[in-house]
């Protein structure tokens, strides 16, 4: 698991906290206005027709609220949610056990759905399309297929890598929603709401400062608030002020744009060793000692979002904005 402070991936200590902070309705949910408004319409229409909601695929970077939205969908539909993940479903029998335990209308939430094995996907296809399950009983010549009817249900899949889903699986989702990075104002509102739940006083400017450095991600904003709260209690009077916030984030090595030592290592590695690029992903991986898929899925998305890095056919290139951030001159071609 990635223990990095600025990782959007969920850490062990985040789980209970996120559950306590999780909004229960779309009205309470901050941000993701486009996805939220569309879901409001689809949910209301399904309820008016007394049908289950179409299967929903939520995709986007980690930490943006996919699990929260899955739970909200179940709450808005007035049904239960059953949660599992792609890696947890190892055999067709595991999936069959989950599907046959569902009640009519229930939401089945599969996190990291792109990690489902293809043999599992094939069992899922008839379940999604026809609400039935084909089970093979026995082996060899005496084997026979038995079809079980399933109650109507809604599958909500979440993934950080929509492109890794097979086309047949992706095409079976009726609703596809991409979750975007949050604005500073949205994150500031989330930080203030979290501080209220924590019963911690926070200045509005301090909330904005945390939001600016949270990489557009609510999970990171809440994690930073927890760490800043520690400094406020030990080094201050318990109130999260602008002064305490700036001091804490500096000591935590989170700069004004939300970059940490790993981001600096990646960008400066390309600048200093490869004159800013282009350089291939595998070479970057060997240079900074991180696995290529971790660089691609965890570190690069935010650097691409803020325009510090470009992916080109010839490799990664550091942009003039990154040079400016480090106070360096871009080499002349």
From Swiss-Prot:
Pfam families: AAA_lid_4, RuvB_C, RuvB_N. Residues 256-333 are annotated as: Head domain (RuvB-H). It catalyses: ATP + H2O = ADP + phosphate + H(+). InterPro entries: AAA+_ATPase (IPR003593), AAA_lid_4 (IPR041445), DNA_helicase_Holl-junc_RuvB (IPR004605), P-loop_NTPase (IPR027417), RuvB-like_N (IPR008824), RuvB_C (IPR008823), WH-like_DNA-bd_sf (IPR036388), WH_DNA-bd_sf (IPR036390). GO terms for molecular function: ATP binding; ATP hydrolysis activity; four-way junction DNA binding; four-way junction helicase activity. DNA binds at residues 311, 316. It is found in: Cytoplasm. Gene3D superfamilies: 1.10.8.60, P-loop containing nucleotide triphosphate hydrolases, Winged helix-like DNA-binding domain superfamily/Winged helix DNA-binding domain. Its EC number is 3.6.4.-. Mg(2+) binds at residue 67. The keyword DNA damage applies. It is an enzyme of class 3 (hydrolase). It comes from the Bacteria. ATP binds at residues 21-22, 63, 66-68, 129-131, 172, 182, 219. Residues 1-182 are annotated as: Large ATPase domain (RuvB-L). GO terms for biological process: DNA recombination; DNA repair. The keyword Nucleotide-binding applies. SMART domains: AAA (SM00382). GO terms for cellular component: cytoplasm; Holliday junction resolvase complex. Residues 183-253 are annotated as: Small ATPAse domain (RuvB-S). Belongs to the RuvB family. The RuvA-RuvB-RuvC complex processes Holliday junction (HJ) DNA during genetic recombination and DNA repair, while the RuvA-RuvB complex plays an important role in the rescue of blocked DNA replication forks via replication fork reversal (RFR). RuvA specifically binds to HJ cruciform DNA, conferring on it an open structure. The RuvB hexamer acts as an ATP-dependent pump, pulling dsDNA into and through the RuvAB complex. RuvB forms 2 homohexamers on either side of HJ DNA bound by 1 or 2 RuvA tetramers; 4 subunits per hexamer contact DNA at a time. Homohexamer. Forms an RuvA(8)-RuvB(12)-Holliday junction (HJ) complex. HJ DNA is sandwiched between 2 RuvA tetramers; dsDNA enters through RuvA and exits via RuvB. An RuvB hexamer assembles on each DNA strand where it exits the tetramer. Each RuvB hexamer is contacted by two RuvA subunits (via domain III) on 2 adjacent RuvB subunits; this complex drives branch migration. In the full resolvosome a probable DNA-RuvA(4)-RuvB(12)-RuvC(2) complex forms which resolves the HJ. Has 3 domains, the large (RuvB-L) and small ATPase (RuvB-S) domains and the C-terminal head (RuvB-H) domain. The head domain binds DNA, while the ATPase domains jointly bind ATP, ADP or are empty depending on the state of the subunit in the translocation cycle. During a single DNA translocation step the structure of each domain remains the same, but their relative positions change. This is Holliday junction branch migration complex subunit RuvB. It comes from Bacillus anthracis. The gene is ruvB.
